Amino acid sequence: MKKLKTLLISAVFALGVTSISGTANACGKLVIAEQNWASAELMANVDKIILEEGYGCEVELVPGATMPTFTSMNDKGTPDMNPEQWANAVYTPLKKAVSEKRLIIANQAPITGLGEGWWINPAAIEKYPQIKNMTAMEILEHPEWFPSKEDASKGGFMGCPAGWGCQLANANLYRAFDMEKKGWVLLDPGSAAGLDGSIAKAADSNEPWIGYYWNPTSMVGKYNLQQLDFGVPFAGRDNWDNCITLAEQDCSDPKPTAWTKSEVNSIVSANFAKTGGKDVLGYVEKRTYPGPVMNGMLVYMADNQGQQWFWQLLRFDHTLLPKVQVDP
């Protein structure tokens, strides 16, 4: 409990909020996307609690994922906020939506110290020590080091679940690097839990694992995943935005490339700014999770399943999180 309180207090100060004794102006009803991975779940729930307890909002959380949530916000104006929008997957349509004033980038960097890419586990390094000095492109010449559970004659590369923007990027990089011809299969984990489960199972059995992941996350820290250098330069935004991040039928000639620099935004609808008002928008603009704080919270969440009590503690223990406002 003491560890949790320390983490929570760290998170509150990291978000740039302080306790006050006064009451905030009511802001109306807001809908926030609770996306299907741990950091997004945490951010959505903390935002809900702060906006309800500190600003008098009525907040509804709705399930979400990178692409479906953005598409819904862009086309229908709902949900009102995505706390953790990985912008690389929607760079061009997001830029257009902002210019046409349908969406607002309320916070350009709500999480610090983040990044996406391809990773390997310690078992791979232990079994093949030379891999420590190899790039992803060099490792792709050795599918036999990572035999697929479905077909041991091929290497298994763990991709992203359906609905995540990285699913399209990994599928197109699979084609760009001619991985099928090299003897690889692109595996679908099915869900966030499936992706995490593949890492955990590989660790438990001390088997090599290679695939997509991102940071900050509890999994990177807990399982000591090592990010790979692609061994090729970033091939430019045109290749990335207009091919790599699109569906296969819209990306006929993907070029080999390193992963683009990761960018995460908190985006809100025009209705959010109108309904929530200046103070609520100001909170979203200023709240930031430093990477170490986020990782600490995520590790605690991962180690303590059945998290409903966690949110209740945040909501009702006002020694930790009473009425809040954004610092001037």
Predicted regions located by residue number:
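N-terminal segment of the mature folded domain
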Residues: 67-125
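A bilobed periplasmic-binding-protein/Venus flytrap-type ligand-binding module shared by bacterial periplasmic
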Residues: 115-128, 262-276, 299-300
